[in-house]
Amino acid sequence: MKATLLLLLLFAVILPGTISAEQEKPGSCPNVDMPIPPLGLCKTTCSKDSDCSETKKCCKNGCGFMTCTTARP
């Protein structure tokens, strides 16, 4: 019984980290912390990288919202 409980606890700790690591795509978001940031679509279109197509990442834009953007290497 204790072994089963310990195993379930171990999966509860490890599994969420594994899932979130799979959702993040390589590359980095463009820098919007500039004196005049590039403006983007002023609405949120994503909440995580997996919401975006192919190589795009979910990044902040110049309006303060999250949108799918081409990732920088």
Curated annotation (Swiss-Prot):
InterPro entries: Elafin-like_sf, WAP_dom
A cellular component term, taken from the record's GO annotations: extracellular space
GO MF annotations in UniProt: peptidase inhibitor activity; receptor antagonist activity; transforming growth factor beta binding
Disulfide partners: 29-59, 42-63, 46-58, 52-68
The WAP domain, residue ranges: 22-72
Tissue: Expressed by the venom gland.
Subcellular location: Secreted
Entries under SMART domains matching the protein: WAP
Keywords: Antibiotic, Antimicrobial, Disulfide bond, Secreted, Signal
Signal sequence range: 1-21
One GO biological process term: transforming growth factor beta receptor signaling pathway
Any Pfam family the entry gives: WAP
Role of this protein: Damages membranes of susceptible bacteria. Has no hemolytic activity. Not toxic to mice. Does not inhibit the proteinases elastase and cathepsin G.
Family according to the record: Belongs to the venom waprin family.
Protein name: Waprin-Phi2
